[in-house]
């Protein structure tokens, strides 16, 4: 057993595989999720060091629960990438993607002012049909992330009601099933129109 770690973290249980609609879905563990966040932070730091003075955009897909990769997340990730690429276009210095079991990630190093980029990304989150399912972080060259409120946008709203999303998450206002059902509806509507 690793020193200083609780037994459950030193010997994590293997991921649970689930069959649904003839697809095998992998549930991730809390340890995997936490490790992926650390790895994402390391990737962000490394990219900013390799490209000093540039802005970093990081995409992750909003997907509650222990299954982070499925048919819906692939549709959401492709739509987000296309929207971001369309906005950033020739300003992109580097694009890097990571389709990990813990969720899809994409990174763009951009030659543009961070606040302007953050406003564009907030516009995508607010106005793209699937934008509520995109998490588009903009990180300044000094590794400081910009929030929506930093650039004059309101905090993100809940998928199901008009409350601030953070408030509903913190208070467990909606069940995971309700949220996943709304995501399913959004992706089906998007697919029907595209």
Feature names for model-found ranges:
Residues 71, 108-111:
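Short glycine/threonine-rich loop-to-helix capping motif typified by GTGT followed
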Residues 18-85, 99, 119-194:
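Long, contiguous binding/interaction regions
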Residues 111-117:
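Helix N-cap motif at beta-to-alpha junctions
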Residues 84-94, 103-107:
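Non-transmembrane, aqueous-exposed alpha-helical and coiled segments at domain scale
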């Amino acid at each position: 057993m690793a020193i200083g770690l609780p037994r459950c973290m030193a010997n994590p249980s293997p991921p649970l595989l689930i069959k649904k609609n003839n697809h095998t879905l992998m549930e991730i563990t809390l340890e995997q999720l936490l490790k992926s966040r650390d790895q994402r932070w390391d990737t962000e730091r490394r990219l900013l060091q390799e490209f000093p003075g540039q802005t970093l955009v990081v995409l992750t897909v909003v997907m509650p629960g222990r299954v982070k990769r499925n048919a819906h997340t692939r549709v959401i990730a492709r739509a987000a990438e296309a929207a971001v690429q369309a906005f950033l276009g020739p300003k992109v210095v580097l694009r890097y993607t990571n389709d990990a079991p813990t969720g899809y990630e994409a990174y763009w190093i951009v030659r543009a002012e961070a606040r302007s980029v953050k406003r564009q990304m907030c516009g995508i989150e607010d106005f793209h049909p699937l934008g509520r399912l995109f998490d588009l972080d903009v990180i300044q060259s000094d590794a400081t992330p910009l929030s929506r409120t930093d650039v004059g946008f309101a905090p993100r709203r809940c998928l199901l009601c008009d409350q601030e999303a953070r408030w509903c998450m913190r208070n467990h206002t909606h069940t995971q099933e309700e949220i996943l059902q709304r995501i399913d509806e959004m992706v089906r509507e998007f697919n029907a129109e595209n």
